[in-house]
């Protein structure tokens, strides 16, 4: 199975002190053990770094620890880069649905899922994706 991980899964999976770690970690572990083929949007890499270095948990990962976590992640997760056309598609999609603001970042992650032709977009925030397109609704899953 090909799974694209949303940052809402990666953050708790990577940080043992996160309250949802036990829920999310098994999916990342399966990817690390090559039981699934895992993908991440390159946008999500920056988002994960930003979030885990500001998490209100103890111990909070330092920037160096966050870098190490992401470097390790990229040894077993495929990063999906977007091109100009992918960004244009995401913007067009948002405009056609009359959706403002930060939802564009979900649209970019959705574009990465479609580009990688995954079977599953794994997220803790399914409504952020199911509202974008019918084909995403069928791909979007929660743990």
Label each residue range with its predicted role.
Residues 1-40, 55-65, 131:
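Short, well-structured N-terminal submotif of metal-dependent ribonuclease cores
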Residues 2, 107-143:
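Acidic, PIN/NYN-like endoribonuclease modules and their adjacent C-terminal/linker elements
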Residues 8-9, 43, 108, 127:
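Alpha-helix/helix-capping structural signal
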Residues 30-34, 54-58, 72-79, 96:
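General structural signal for alpha-helix termini and helix-helix connectors
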Residues 39-42, 123:
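Short beta-strand segments at enzyme active-site cores
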Residues 62, 71-87, 98, 129-143:
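Short acidic, glycine/proline-enriched helix-loop-strand junctions
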Residues 78-124:
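Active-site neighborhoods of divalent-metal-dependent phosphate/nucleic-acid chemistry enzymes
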């Amino acid at each position: 199975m090909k799974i694209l991980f949303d940052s809402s899964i990666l953050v708790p999976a990577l940080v043992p002190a996160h309250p949802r770690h036990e829920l999310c970690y098994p999916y990342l572990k399966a990817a690390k053990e090559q039981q699934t083929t895992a993908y991440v949007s390159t946008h999500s890499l920056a988002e994960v770094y930003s979030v885990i270095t500001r998490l209100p948990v103890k111990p909070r990962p330092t920037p160096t620890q966050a870098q190490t976590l992401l470097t390790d992640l990229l040894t077993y997760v495929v990063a999906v880069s977007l091109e100009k056309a992918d960004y244009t598609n995401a913007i067009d999609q948002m405009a056609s649905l009359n959706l403002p603001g930060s939802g564009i970042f979900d649209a970019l992650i959705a574009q990465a899922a479609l580009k990688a032709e995954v079977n599953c977009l794994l997220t803790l925030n399914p409504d952020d994706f199911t509202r974008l397109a019918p084909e995403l609704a069928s791909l979007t899953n929660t743990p």
